[in-house]
Amino acid sequence: MNNSKYVFAQLTVFLDRNHFNYLVRKYGGNKYVKHFTCWNQLLAMMFGQLSNRESLRDLVVAIEAHRSKCYHLGFGKNVSKTSLARANQTRDFHIFEEFAYYLVGEARRKRATDIFKLDGNVYAFDSTTVSLCLEVFWWAKFSKYKGGIKIHTLYDLETQIPAFFHISTASVYDSKVMKEIPIESGAYYIFDRGYNNFKELYRIHCTGSFFVVRAKSNLQYKCIKWKRRLPDGILTDAEIELTFSDSRKRYPEHLRLVRFFDEEQSREFMFLSNAFELTSPQVADLYKNRWQIELFFKWLKQHLKIKRFWGTTENAVRIQIYSAICAYCLVAIIQHDMHLDRSTYEVLQILSMSLTDTTPLKDLFNKTIFKNDKERFGFNEPTLFDNFD
């Protein structure tokens, strides 16, 4: 059935066009549009992500090289640099943001697991900074001479899918964005030291959710009671009360303090949590799994285009980031639905070289043989989605 369909066209079958069209109607995205629709725009942007294009000009040149295939690839009649740049600059980014969230929901539903054996979902929250030229991206002012944006992400550690993302200028403190996090009752939220915002931690506590946050070294507290028999690696497991007046005002209840020594790194870590039911090794293990979000950021920057932007306006930057997230989720959905026993790096490499081929997807992934990433490049390539049901 797919013998005459291009690989990229086969990929788009995994996208819900009806839902995307609903969002286009909701925001009037195709108003006064004759040829280059929002759907054409989305596919062009995702083609650029999957084919590893470096710039808008690079993307348009690549599409122009396949002019005769444009219609069957889903781009419409043709794609010019002017039309794509104008679309990214003027069309409502909420269309692409909400579609990215829709794909996030689909990917998370398909990849649901129970790795931690806990009743609620387990999330890590962190941000990554992308530096920008202040003269060009004037709206992203960070300091007098620098520009940049932050991508704040709530990462589902079990499905390995970003559940929530918030884009801000780089000048915004990480802890200030905690108020934007959607809180689920019974879920677990893992934070690094930059998120010692006791007001927001107490909000999580009051909604019946749990948190584990790495404590700052200058934390002021007093022990209320502590455990004397401790598992290996656990130095302290105590119930504490905050003593600094402002902190105690923001978090008036007792907290749990766990000090853990990591033999692999020869480092000591101190955590705060409201999860008194967990064992102390479970608390430490939850934090140790926070590294997955750092791998996600590294993977996103290395293999999708969010470090070099194809437009200079805030709207264009947002559309590019949401297109990258759509591409990320598309790979996750394909891996699950096709039961691919490959890393995301392998899947992307295969796709980037084959988007305009007419090989059926099943044959494409079965016939292409890649050596182990580490053997090929001599370094540890972060891989995600490697395990699925």
What would you call each of these model-derived segments?
Residues 82-86, 107-110, 368-374:
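Short alpha-helical linear motifs
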Residues 140:
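A glycine- and small-aliphatic-rich helix-loop capping segment at beta-alpha/alpha-beta transitions
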Residues 105-113, 174-175:
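A short, well-structured juxtamembrane/interface segment
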Residues 1-58, 91, 98-102, 117-121, ...:
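Single, function-defining residue in the core of a domain
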Residues 55-73:
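DNA-recognition alpha helix
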Residues 73-91:
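Major-groove recognition helix of helix-turn-helix-like DNA-binding domains
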